[in-house]
Amino acid sequence: IDGGSQAAIRYGVYALQRAEVLGKANTDLDIHEKPYYEYRILNHWDNLDDTVERGYAGLSMWEWTAKEIPAKRIHHYGELCASVGLNGAVLNNVNANPLILDKEHIERVAQIANILREYGITTYLSIKWTSPITLDGLKSGDPLDPKVRQWWKNKASEISAAIPDFGGFLVKANSEGQAGPQDYGRTHADGANMLAEAVAPYGGIIMWRAFVYSPSSSDRANQAVEEFKSLDGQFADNVIIQIKNGPIDFQPREPFSPLFGQLYNTPMMMEFQITQEYLGFSNHLVYHGTTYEECLDLSLMHISEPTRQAE
């Protein structure tokens, strides 16, 4: 078993174990694999009071309110994720509490990251746009304000000092009433690029969610296209637009987001919902795999040559 990194070798060990379980581990077993996607990340909608938004299986696995982190459980989690090739975890809810960025919580996140690192898993955090205002009394969240930009640079430096391989931020902004760059007459690109500049020295990325809608929109299913298509090519290289598979909200059956195939010069990542918000909560057992497969295999016919959405 060999690979280009310790994580790759770990994936190889799990591949051999799978072959053994399936009765395929014979002497001519020869598997060569390379991940198609660079980032394979779980977003946890865990809150700092240990509740979990749309969580139907108990309280937060990170146990934010406990004195010590649940190290044994986090080791099990890391092994579970690595066994299926996942390499990143966003620890907190996209509807973020600004306190995730205070000194106490950064130290706790660093303890978690120290364990996840053993399994090739990079740690990320969700942030609230108004954090500079809430935590340090800044008067504005304008992404073109030098004071705001410097605040985020300082915060990225502080986090990276505690977590050298910190992955970056996941951002929900100007959606469902939450603040964002549009509150200051700026664009999603202005906001994302400010954060991208802050994490770039440490190799970080910004995952900017395209789940944006407001009651005033005349066509909610197309609002992401209306807000992002004109910004194609304006985002920094380390910004990825995170797009839900459906244009409304993870509905069991709905068309796929019209934003796929509309961004030719901007990296995209697809967001699926594993928790059963629309599929029976904790009352039913539903297999999601075929839904994901259907979405990834769809051909985008409006492009010059039919292209799988996965591409």
Model-derived regions, located:
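Well-ordered, non-membrane alpha-helical segments in soluble/globular domains
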Residues: 70, 74, 106-109, 148-153, ...
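Polar, glycine-rich mid-to-C-terminal structural blocks
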Residues: 204-287
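Single conserved hydrophobic/aromatic residue that forms the stacking wall/gate
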Residues: 301-311
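Acidic-and-aromatic substrate-binding clefts and catalytic sites of carbohydrate-active enzymes
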Residues: 95-107, 177-180, 186, 213-220, ...
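Conserved protein kinase catalytic core
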Residues: 132-134, 178, 311
